[in-house]
Amino acid sequence: MLSAQLEAYLAEINLPATAEQKKQLLDFVGMLNKWNKAYNLTSVRDPEAMLVRHIMDSLVVSPHLQGEHFIDVGTGPGLPGIPLAIMNPDKTFVLLDSLGKRIRFQKQVAFELGIHNISSIESRVEAYQPEQKFDGVLSRAFASIHDMLTWCHHLPAEHGQFYALKGQLSDEEMQQIPAGFVVTETIELKVPRLDEQRHLLKIIKE
């Protein structure tokens, strides 16, 4: 059932996937559902809802990624980082979260599913000082845009971008973007079977 739904959703957003990638995405949902019962990793309890609200909600960003080296800040159980890593094996993803149980889950997922292009790091974002800066800084349900930019300002490389995944955009939040940052693109995203607003904001440092 889930397999057929995933197939249909991927076709709907026109995202090609190999049989192995589809299996990894479904196995990730299975592991998230299993671990969630003990570790409370997400408020979404149903695998079908996870497929829409977590997997597809992450994957609609995939065509918009530019660069090779990304960080997913406040990633939680690995969202959007793990689905994006599965679909972009040529890119690398650092998954950053301050809670150990989430990092343990991510590492187990990477091990069991054979995902080799992610590394999970337990740290608060403002304390994390990477040796190599990032082409893209991803944030989904992590913080307000103002806080994301304030806390993550040190993470992008010279021509790196921030990718803020938001629901409904409020004028108030947009007006609070700190000085020195510019929104270069606002993209309306359509997630299959999700009747809610989704937006991707691309932001650069001036």
Swiss-Prot record:
Top enzyme class: transferase
Name of the protein in its database record: Ribosomal RNA small subunit methyltransferase G
Taxonomic superkingdom: Bacteria
Binding site residues for S-adenosyl-L-methionine: G74, L79, V125, E126, R140
GO CC terms of this entry: cytosol
Keyword GTP-binding recorded: no
InterPro entries per record: rRNA_ssu_MeTfrase_G, SAM-dependent_MTases_sf
Pfam families per UniProt: GidB
Main localization of the protein described in the UniProt heading: cytoplasm
Catalysed conversion reaction: guanosine(527) in 16S rRNA + S-adenosyl-L-methionine = N(7)-methylguanosine(527) in 16S rRNA + S-adenosyl-L-homocysteine
A GO molecular-function descriptor: rRNA (guanine-N7-)-methyltransferase activity
Keyword flag Cytoplasm: yes
Family, as annotated: Belongs to the methyltransferase superfamily. RNA methyltransferase RsmG family.
Signal peptide from the UniProt entry: none
EC number annotated for this UniProt entry: 2.1.1.170
Annotated keywords: Cytoplasm, Methyltransferase, rRNA processing, S-adenosyl-L-methionine, Transferase
Disulfide bond residue pairs: none
